[in-house]
């Protein structure tokens, strides 16, 4: 089906020039890996088993935590394989699939944050109709739409990777596969693969960011009009966790995009560090932010710990 696909594996790299320190570098990476798994896993478990959290806001948070887990489980096994045992080889199919999931899940994460912004918008701008607007059916439809958009939109460029031949090199300057890294190694016309991602990012991630920004302008306008200071603070507190997660995700996305597109003279180590920050920082911080800033999550954790304490 894919006559031009190479049988040779790709070679991943960790931190070029720091190979001797890979075992030491693996310590903080493994610690972050475990924290991401525990933090997001705890959120998923808590929301599933605590019926007081069975609300649209927490369903969307489940989408975010699930996406963060999938991103981490997609990228970190190859990272740790290199740092621990210097396992650099990855099959071409495995590499393409890893790139597919990484990029798809980035679009899904942006869509999840957009859905959460919609939840905040309805909760503050139209609280009396909140339950009638965000029904379970609509929440499911939004969730399915977010995942379909992410996993379908990235398919065209990934499918083209299967038909390219790779005669330049098989070395990828990351510990995981990214579309832009694979694309550069192809001995073929990659014009479509250069242009499509720019259009896709503009119509998904950047457009999502603009819609979220506009929604918060309207939310702020509503909050300013609330007479009671206590009610104003309560309204703002409803969305403060989401605002923090939005800032972390989109600042890292824009930083990585800016460096990739315009940072030709930026040292390669900066590109590498930014890619790790992009894939690790949001999944690490999102559960921390929601655990600290959201009282319902805090109460849920306390109830969960108390339940296990008394049961033991």
Swiss-Prot record:
The chain crosses the membrane at residues 24-44, 53-73, 98-118, 138-158, 195-215, 236-256, 272-292. Residues 45-52, 119-137, 216-235, 293-312 are cytoplasmic. GO terms for cellular component: plasma membrane. It is found in: Cell membrane. It comes from the Eukaryota. It is a multi-pass membrane protein. Disulfide bonds join 95-187. Residues 1-23, 74-97, 159-194, 257-271 are extracellular. Keywords: Cell membrane, Disulfide bond, G-protein coupled receptor, Glycoprotein, Membrane, Olfaction, Receptor, Sensory transduction, Transducer, Transmembrane, Transmembrane helix, Ubl conjugation. Its main location: membrane. The keyword Hydrolase does not apply. GO terms for molecular function: G protein-coupled receptor activity; olfactory receptor activity. Ubiquitinated by the CRL2(FEM1A) and CRL2(FEM1C) complexes, which recognize the -Lys-Xaa-Xaa-Arg C-degron at the C-terminus, leading to its degradation. Glycans are attached at residue 4. CDD domains: 7tmA_OR51-like (cd15222). Odorant receptor. Belongs to the G-protein coupled receptor 1 family. This is Olfactory receptor 51B2. It comes from Homo sapiens. The gene is OR51B2.
């Amino acid at each position: 089906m894919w006559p031009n696909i190479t049988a040779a594996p790709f070679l991943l790299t960790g931190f070029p020039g720091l190979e001797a320190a890979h075992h030491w570098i693996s310590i903080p990476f493994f610690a972050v890996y475990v924290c991401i798994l525990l933090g997001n896993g705890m959120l998923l478990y808590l929301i599933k088993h605590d019926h007081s959290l069975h609300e649209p806001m927490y369903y969307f948070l489940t989408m975010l935590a699930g996406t963060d887990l999938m991103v981490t489980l997609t990228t970190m096994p190859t990272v740790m394989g290199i740092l621990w045992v210097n396992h650099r080889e990855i099959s071409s199919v495995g590499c393409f699939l890893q790139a597919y999931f990484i990029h798809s899940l980035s679009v899904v994460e942006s869509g999840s944050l957009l859905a959460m912004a919609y939840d905040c918008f309805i909760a503050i701008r139209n609280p009396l109709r909140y339950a009638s607007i965000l029904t379970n059916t609509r929440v499911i439809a939004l969730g399915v739409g977010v995942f379909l958009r992410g996993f379908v939109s990235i398919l065209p460029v990934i499918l083209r990777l299967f038909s390219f031949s790779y005669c330049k090199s098989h070395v990828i300057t990351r510990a995981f596969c990214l579309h832009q890294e694979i694309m550069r190694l192809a001995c073929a016309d990659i014009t479509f693969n250069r242009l499509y991602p720019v259009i896709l990012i503009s119509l998904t991630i950047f457009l999502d960011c603009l819609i979220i920004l506009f929604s918060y302008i309207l939310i702020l306008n509503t909050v300013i009009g609330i007479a009671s200071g206590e009610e104003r603070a309560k309204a703002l507190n409803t969305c403060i966790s989401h605002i923090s997660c939005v800032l972390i995700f989109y600042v890292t996305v824009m930083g990585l995009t800016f460096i990739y597109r315009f940072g030709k003279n930026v040292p390669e180590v900066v590109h590498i560090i930014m890619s790790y920050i992009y894939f690790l920082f949001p999944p690490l911080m999102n559960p921390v932010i929601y655990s600290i800033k959201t009282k319902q999550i805090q109460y849920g954790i306390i109830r969960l710990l108390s339940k296990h304490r008394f049961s033991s």
